[in-house]
């Protein structure tokens, strides 16, 4: 295992100045290294000396104190796993649970162990060289935004592109030919602007090329191994770590890391150590190394699940890769979200790995400090996909200076190198201009210069030499090392360390942890299904009290319910598949496990909850329904249903693994659900199926299982007959063949019906097929299981697309038209000017930066710099703040489990107009929490203290009077930049301001943020929309467009940006401050230059405790002086003050403060001055007159009606621009209704035809679940954006939000209902019934109204279940159970007369009761019935009587039925019904109630909407509780979210 450097091997010595390595120290270390033998591990420490930056930024005490002992220690290779303090060889530096633990010592000790027995441990290394490397991606076929109308055209174009011969325009070049060489032990930093190809380069050299292609001419070699060999055999040795932190949120940090450790534990580990002990030890070392030990039992979390902080989550990602022990690592912006000191320690860690373990690391860093840069051996500079330099990191500056560029004195080397790629940023040396020397400026010019340079020739020679000297021995060394690490049963050619079954074992443990940590979902499913068993079983309870032939239909219906409920209980598993897929993809690239092993383990881990659910449901249901009381029959019933559960589970998993998104999966899943349920054999017996569709029955596993269940229940049973034809009155004494049982399968003269006869005549089922169902079911279980494993193993994720802006189609047309005109008028335009115009970096900010770099010196006046900045900015009428915002004794407590934790501890401060205040601290110190508390954005916990505006408590308009730029760039992805800004301006600026003025202000914001080139671009998603920088600008722009009059909060505005964009962003903030705006900004990685742009600093340490609040001073001298006066070691002149300060207070990883600087602050004179200033503010400012303007004190700037209008317009626009949701809804509707319609095509007027029409209506409603599952994620996306950004800023009211959701969804559902009506109504043949009854128009119109109402009802119930739920999956569970209950009690499966009296109320409150009653009566009423031959009952009339004479009394009483031949004397053929209304009466359906039912159903829809609105208010709208402190002032505004416990 490799480990990073523990940057603080010893605590900071306050008596030693922070001066770095001086000449004497370097001399002593060199002498010490020479004195040791070659075998000593201190040979690697000579390279550590080279690691020391030339500017002396490494702390001296790390060398002169305990570090010196590490450098000189001759480790004996102590087994670190069983370190015991009682043992003589115990070394605290090797114990991860000790405060004295040193990761560097641990690595050196492990290196000593491995080098001591090379035959066992097989040490090896991997380098890489690439030659003429170029990459290309598929040109996106979506150059314009997709909408509901243009999506089909785009899809047809895409099909045409696939069908026609390939063209050069089908691909675009991401990387142009480039070269590089990395030897073992080297570090490479890749510098370039966003979009320059940094990520693609890292993916290319790490052989992670899914989504783009490497050209055939490219050469990539890893010690002689090709990329294909790496992918196939050594995937885990070459790793790419993406920027995003993707983890299973419900796992703890320990569980996440120990799983990786188990899967990467080598066979040739430390001798005498078990696999489990080694994995646990390595996990402890990783957590200690990266400062995660305190989060051991904390969930990793994500945006929805509370867990560790963002910085800690990033460290978990880093620890994962470290545990993997990869020899070649590629890190994509791995320092994002880390403070500057932690980022530096991360690079130092990589340096230690490189020197001691001979690892290779390539890092793309957007904001690279000089200290971090000094640790790299090589640098690659990319410019729009071209490589313009590769070579020695320290020589790069000289190279570009020779090219003709000037590096200002204060500019760091990485900033200088990145600035070369920005025409607005770079500066040409005046001497070159004066001499007329041409300086390369375009990418092509720079590439040409690079290819003609001596550095390039030398690089090519080294690459050629390396390729020439690569041999089979190098490959064999890697192969032997890889095999030595593999477990016993692992294939030697496999890239994985442990065997397949061990992978399954460890993932299984992980999955059980997941289930345990999120047990609420599983428990809800188990107990929810058990409750449904009680409900459904009791519904059939009265029916099954007897075992007469009258119960045949209901007994079959109960069995049908049983198998469907068991089979489709796994449908929602599709949700969880998409949650875990990104993690599986990541772990596949780390070679942790086969994706199929993860699938295998997921199936096994779901067995216990499935079995428990099946046991509870089936026991309850079986005995309540009163199925056969026979042990053998019960266990067979249970076995068949369990097979149904797993067969369908595996089938739905196959569907999920084939599709890329949940909405894509819902269409085939719903079609399968419909087909499987309709062709089970109950709704339509196989003998009655249409010829074209009968094949579906033969491939339907549920059909065979249902047959087995029915045979199991009916075989070898006699069912007494209670109902005869004829019966009653004089017929009571009739016996023999003169009457017949009114049941299918009855025989004249018998007073019973054999179950086998019933099955044969009704379904063509036979007892000999009983075990056939079991065999077929098991075959399907096994088949779908292996298909699922194969799909998971070989189905890759979605391909990436190159970064591109997307515009609406109308804008693209306009741009093309303008482009043709521009091409004609600007044919001779200088290309450099065009390039300058295309850049999005703020030129004003660049000029200010250059001026600052040139003019800064000890005597420079910071005010002159500021005035220069002010003079360079355009006057756009930005709002100016006049109020002072201040807070005192601010505390924030949150309940965590059984205790209350204090997050903020008596924080004081203020923000004045025209000042730029920085808020800093280590990860988890409470910076974002402080901003949330100040901005009234907390949703839980208790806030105490005073938060004032001009000495008075915040009023109701406070939230909309501030701007809050969140760290996450949250925007509506379908809107354009200009639309986003206007939406903010329209709703957050006062209504008294005209639309024209608001539009002008928006244009001014676009201009000051330099967003003109993409003002009409769609926000989109990363890769297809705005890039990181553009999103950050839009985030700031949205808040500026609101024209905040008090202050602006910015949370990590520079996170993820390159140094130039970070500088431009900082200058923008400075510009706003110069316009009188008050700004409070959190910042993680400020460079020395960025730091000095701030006026004041509020610094927090762990626990939310203040360490410093005050002026920074010129060059941060005021802040530095404060810490130095209070015991801190001296800050070197060239050090970054931010990094120095983090180390002083112990906020940097591994550093330790020499005292509690919070207590130092509380006892300082500066603290007293702050308190005095706050008291003075409170007294003086409170005397100012209040703003009596009515608009100033409103919670929202505009009226509710105006908000509602704008939100509706935006939401309708979003639906129109989200064609995948709408087309999924409509395609699902069309295919479902076509399937139902043609399955029951033109149903006739026989009894079976009537039953088919009734069951078709029943199936018509089954589309509910898929429609619901499509809608819920769409609503959640809207809600997340509103609750995260728009509600806290008081953009618009929750009432406008929820009402708009209702109003905009309804029209699309009306369209869906109309489509369903047109297809279903006419294909089933209801129109023929209406025509025969001479009611064609009325009944057709009414059926259409009901069809629309049903689709609207789906949306209303969806809103109801998601209104109080956080997660769509839970809401889908609740919605599915509610729908199942409504469908069960609607009167189709069990008539109200047959239900227990207790459940009659459910029949009456089920909305589907009224829907199906009305649809059925409207569809089939007032039509004559004509029975088929098989439906006629046959009996013999008494001697001497005709059939008519014999049946006349019966017909007069019954009022329904007819004889086919009343004059017959030998056999009477009788049909039980003569009129459809008589059939409707048996299911309690009445035609005259149709309009009443419509009104009641509409009331259900209204109720769902009203209840949904109420529950949303109750569960998710913050309630304000003003608490009064002892001094009588308002202490807090506490937000409480009352969550419904689901």
From Swiss-Prot:
Cytoplasmic-side positions: 1-517, 793-1220, 1516-1542
Organism: Candida glabrata (strain ATCC 2001 / BCRC 20586 / JCM 3761 / NBRC 0622 / NRRL Y-65 / CBS 138)
Basic and acidic residues composition-biased segments: 24-33, 825-834
Location in the cell: Cell membrane
UniProt record similarity statement: Belongs to the ABC transporter superfamily. ABCG family. PDR (TC 3.A.1.205) subfamily.
Biased composition (Polar residues): 35-47, 835-846
Protein's name in the database: Pleiotropic ABC efflux transporter of multiple drugs PDH1
Processing after translation: Phosphorylated by PKA. Dephosphorylated on glucose depletion and independently rephosphorylated during glucose exposure or under stress.
Induction of synthesis: Azole exposure induced expression via regulation by the transcription factor PDR1 that stimulates gene expression via binding to elements called pleiotropic drug response elements (PDREs). Expression is up-regulated in azole-resistant isolates and in presence of fluconazole. Loss of mitochondrial functions leads to increased expression. Expression is temporary increased during the intermediate phase of biofilm development. Expression is down-regulated by the transcription factor STB5.
InterPro entries in UniProt: AAA+_ATPase, ABC2_TM, ABC_trans_N, ABC_transporter-like_ATP-bd, ABC_transporter-like_CS, ABCG_dom, ABCG_PDR_1, ABCG_PDR_2
Null mutant phenotype: Increases the susceptibility to rhodamine 6G, cycloheximide and chloramphenicol, and also increases rhodamine 6G accumulation. Suppresses the development of high-frequency azole resistance (HFAR) in a medium containing fluconazole. Impairs the blockage of the efflux of fluconazole by milbemycin A4 oxime when CDR1 is also deleted.
Keyword field contains Lipid metabolism: no
CDD domains, sorted: ABCG_PDR_domain1, ABCG_PDR_domain2
GO cellular component: plasma membrane
Keywords, comma-separated and alphabetical: ATP-binding, Cell membrane, Membrane, Nucleotide-binding, Phosphoprotein, Repeat, Transmembrane, Transmembrane helix, Transport
Membrane topology: Multi-pass membrane protein
A biological process term (GO) from this entry: response to xenobiotic stimulus
Every ABC transporter domain range: 153-409, 885-1128
């Amino acid at each position: 295992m490799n480990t990073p450097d523990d940057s603080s091997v010893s605590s900071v010595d306050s008596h030693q100045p922070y001066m770095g390595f001086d000449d004497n120290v370097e001399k002593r270390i060199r002498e010490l290294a020479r004195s040791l033998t070659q075998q000593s591990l201190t040979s690697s420490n000579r390279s550590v000396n080279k690691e020391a930056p030339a500017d002396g930024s490494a702390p001296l005490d790390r060398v002169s104190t305990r570090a010196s002992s590490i450098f000189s220690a001759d480790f004996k290779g102590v087994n670190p796993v069983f370190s015991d303090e009682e043992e003589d060889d115990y070394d605290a530096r090797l114990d991860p649970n000790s405060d004295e633990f040193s990761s560097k010592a641990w690595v050196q000790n492990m290196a000593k162990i491995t080098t001591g027995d090379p035959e066992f441990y097989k040490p090896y290394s991997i380098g890489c060289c690439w030659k003429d490397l170029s990459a290309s991606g598929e040109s996106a076929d979506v150059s314009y935004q997709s909408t509901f109308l243009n999506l089909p055209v785009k899809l047809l174009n895409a099909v045409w592109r696939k069908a026609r011969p390939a063209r050069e325009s089908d691909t675009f070049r991401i990387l142009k030919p480039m070269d590089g060489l990395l030897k073992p032990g080297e570090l490479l930093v890749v510098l370039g602007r966003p979009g320059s190809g940094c990520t693609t380069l890292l993916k290319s050299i790490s052989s992670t090329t899914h989504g783009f292609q490497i050209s055939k001419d490219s050469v990539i070699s890893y010690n002689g191994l090709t990329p294909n060999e790496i992918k196939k055999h050594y995937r885990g040795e070459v790793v790419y770590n993406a920027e995003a932190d993707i983890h299973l949120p419900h796992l703890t940090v320990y569980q996440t890391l120990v799983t990786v450790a188990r899967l990467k534990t080598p066979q040739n580990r430390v001798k005498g150590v078990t696999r489990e002990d080694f994995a646990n030890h390595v996990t402890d070392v990783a957590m200690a190394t990266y400062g995660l030990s305190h989060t051991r039992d904390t969930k990793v979390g994500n945006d929805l699940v509370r867990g560790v902080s963002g910085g800690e989550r990033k460290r978990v990602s880093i620890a994962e890769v470290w545990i993997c022990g990869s020899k070649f690592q590629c890190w994509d912006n791995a320092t994002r979200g880390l403070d500057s000191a932690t980022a530096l320690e991360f690079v130092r860690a990589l340096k230690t790995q490189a020197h001691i373990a001979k690892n290779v690391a390539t890092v793309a860093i957007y904001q690279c400090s000089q200290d971090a840069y000094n640790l790299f051996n090589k640098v690659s500079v990319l410019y729009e996909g071209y490589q313009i330099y590769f070579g020695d990191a320290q020589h790069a500056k000289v190279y570009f200076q020779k090219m003709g560029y000037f590096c200002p004195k204060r500019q760091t080397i990485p900033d200088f190198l990145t600035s070369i790629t920005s025409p607005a940023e770079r500066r040409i040396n005046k001497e070159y201009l004066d001499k007329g020397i041409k300086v390369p400026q375009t990418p092509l010019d720079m590439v040409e210069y690079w290819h003609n340079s001596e550095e390039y020739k030398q690089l090519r020679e080294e690459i050629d030499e390396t390729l020439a000297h690569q041999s089979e021995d190098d490959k064999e060394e890697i192969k032997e090392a890889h095999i030595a690490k593999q477990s016993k049963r692992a294939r030697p050619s496999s890239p994985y360390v442990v065997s397949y079954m061990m992978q399954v074992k460890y993932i299984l443990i992980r999955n059980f942890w997941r289930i345990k940590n999120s047990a609420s979902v599983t428990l809800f499913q188990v107990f929810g299904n058990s409750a449904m068993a009680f409900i459904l079983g009791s519904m059939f309870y009265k029916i099954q009290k007897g075992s007469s032939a009258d119960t045949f239909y209901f007994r079959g219906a109960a069995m049908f319910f049983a198998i469907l409920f068991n089979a489709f209980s796994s449908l929602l598993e599709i949700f969880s598949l998409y949650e875990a897929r990104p993690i599986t993809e990541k772990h596949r690239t780390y070679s942790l496990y086969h994706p199929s092993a993860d699938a295998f383990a997921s199936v096994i881990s779901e067995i216990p909850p499935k079995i428990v659910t099946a046991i509870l449901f089936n026991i309850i249901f079986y005995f309540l329904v009163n199925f056969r009381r026979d042990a053998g029959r019960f266990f067979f019933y249970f076995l068949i249903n369990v097979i149904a559960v797993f067969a369908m589970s595996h089938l739905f998993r196959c569907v999920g693994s084939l599709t890329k998104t949940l909405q894509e999966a819902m269409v085939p899943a719903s079609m399968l659900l419909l087909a499987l349920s309709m062709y089970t054999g109950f709704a339509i017996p196989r003998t009655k199926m249409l010829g074209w569709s009968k094949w579906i029955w033969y491939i339907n596993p549920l059909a065979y299982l249902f047959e087995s269940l029915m045979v199991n229940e009916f075989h070898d049973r006699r069912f007494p007959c209670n109902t005869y034809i004829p019966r009653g009155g004089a017929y009571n004494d009739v016996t023999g063949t003169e009457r017949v049982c009114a049941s299918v399968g009855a025989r004249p003269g018998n007073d019973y019906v054999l179950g086998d006869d019933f099955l044969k005549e009704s379904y063509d089922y036979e007892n000999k097929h009983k075990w056939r169902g079991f065999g077929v079911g098991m075959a399907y279980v096994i088949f779908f299981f292996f298909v699922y494993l194969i799909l998971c193993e070989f189905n890759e994720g979605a391909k990436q697309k190159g970064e591109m802006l997307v515009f609406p189609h109308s804008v693209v047309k306009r741009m093309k038209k303008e482009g043709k005109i521009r091409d004609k008028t600007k044919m001779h335009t200088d290309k450099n000017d065009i390039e300058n115009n295309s850049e999005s970096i703020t030129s004003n900010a660049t000029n200010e930066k250059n001026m600052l770099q040139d003019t800064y010196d000890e005597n420079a006046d910071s005010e002159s710099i500021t005035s220069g900045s002010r003079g360079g900015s355009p006057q756009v009428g930005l709002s100016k703040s006049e109020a002072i915002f201040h807070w005192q004794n601010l505390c924030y407590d949150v309940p965590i489990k059984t205790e209350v934790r204090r997050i903020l501890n008596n924080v004081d401060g203020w923000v004045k107009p025209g000042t730029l205040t920085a808020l800093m601290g280590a990860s988890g110190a409470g910076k974002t929490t402080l901003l949330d508390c100040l901005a009234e954005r907390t949703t839980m916990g208790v806030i105490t203290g005073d938060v004032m505006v001009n000495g008075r408590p915040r009023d109701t308009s406070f939230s909309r009077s501030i701007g809050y730029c969140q760290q996450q760039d949250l925007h509506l992805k379908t809107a354009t930049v200009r639309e986003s800004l206007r939406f903010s301006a329209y709703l957050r600026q006062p209504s008294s301001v005209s639309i024209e003025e608001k539009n002008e202000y928006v244009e001014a914001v676009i201009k000051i943020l330099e967003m003109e080139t993409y003002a009409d671009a769609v926000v989109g998603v990363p890769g297809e929309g705005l890039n990181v920088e553009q999103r950050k600008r839009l985030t700031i722009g949205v808040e500026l467009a609101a024209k905040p009059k008090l202050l602006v909060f910015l949370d990590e505005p520079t996170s993820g940006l390159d140094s130039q964009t970070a500088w431009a962003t900082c200058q923008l903030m400075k510009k706003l401050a110069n316009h009188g705006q008050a700004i409070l900004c959190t910042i993680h990685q400020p460079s020395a230059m960025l730091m000095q742009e701030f006026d004041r600093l509020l610094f927090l340490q762990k626990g939310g405790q203040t360490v410093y609040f005050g002026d920074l001073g010129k060059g941060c001298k005021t802040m530095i002086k404060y810490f130095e006066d209070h015991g801190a070691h001296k800050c070197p002149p060239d050090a970054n003050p931010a990094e120095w300060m983090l180390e002083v207070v112990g906020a940097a990883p591994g550093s330790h403060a020499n005292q509690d600087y919070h207590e130092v602050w509380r006892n300082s004179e500066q603290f007293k001055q702050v308190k005095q200033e706050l008291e003075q503010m409170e007294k003086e400012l409170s005397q100012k007159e209040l703003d009596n303007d009515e608009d100033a004190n409103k919670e929202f700037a505009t009226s509710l009606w105006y908000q509602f209008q704008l939100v509706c317009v935006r939401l309708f626009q979003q639906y129109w621009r989200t064609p995948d949701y709408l087309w999924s809804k409509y395609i699902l509707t069309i295919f479902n209704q076509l399937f139902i319609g043609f399955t029951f095509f033109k149903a006739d007027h026989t009894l079976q035809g009537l039953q088919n029409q009734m069951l078709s209506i029943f199936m018509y409603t089954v589309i509910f679940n898929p429609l619901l599952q499509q809608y819920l994620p769409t609503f959640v996306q809207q809600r997340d954006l509103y609750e995260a950004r728009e509600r806290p800023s008081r953009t618009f009211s929750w009432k406008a939000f929820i009402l708009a959701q209702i109003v905009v969804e309804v029209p699309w559902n009306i369209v869906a209902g109309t489509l369903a009506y047109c297809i279903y109504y006419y294909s089933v043949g209801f129109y023929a019934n209406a025509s025969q009854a001479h009611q064609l128009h009325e009944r057709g119109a009414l059926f259409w109204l009901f069809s629309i109402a049903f689709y609207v009802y789906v949306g209303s119930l969806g809103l109801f279940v998601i209104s109080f739920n956080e997660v769509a999956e839970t809401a889908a569970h609740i919605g599915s159970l509610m729908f199942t209950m409504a469908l069960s009690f609607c009167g189709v499966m069990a008539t109200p007369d047959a239900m227990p009296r207790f459940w009659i109320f459910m029949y009456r409150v089920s909305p589907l009761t009224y829907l199906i009653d009305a649809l059925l009566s409207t569809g089939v009423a007032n039509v004559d019935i004509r029975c088929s031959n098989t439906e006629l009952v046959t009996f013999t009339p008494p001697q001497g009587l005709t059939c008519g004479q014999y049946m006349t009394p019966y017909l007069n009483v019954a009022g329904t039925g007819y004889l086919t031949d009343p004059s017959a004397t030998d056999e009477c053929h009788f049909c039980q019904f003569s009129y459809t209304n008589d059939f409707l009466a048996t299911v309690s359906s009445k035609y005259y109630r149709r309009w009443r039912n419509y009104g009641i159903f509409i009331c259900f829809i209204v109720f769902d909407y009203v209840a949904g609105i109420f529950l949303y208010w109750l569960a998710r709208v913050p309630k304000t509780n003003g608490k009064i402190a002892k001094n009588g002032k308002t202490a807090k505004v506490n937000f409480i979210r009352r969550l419904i416990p689901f």
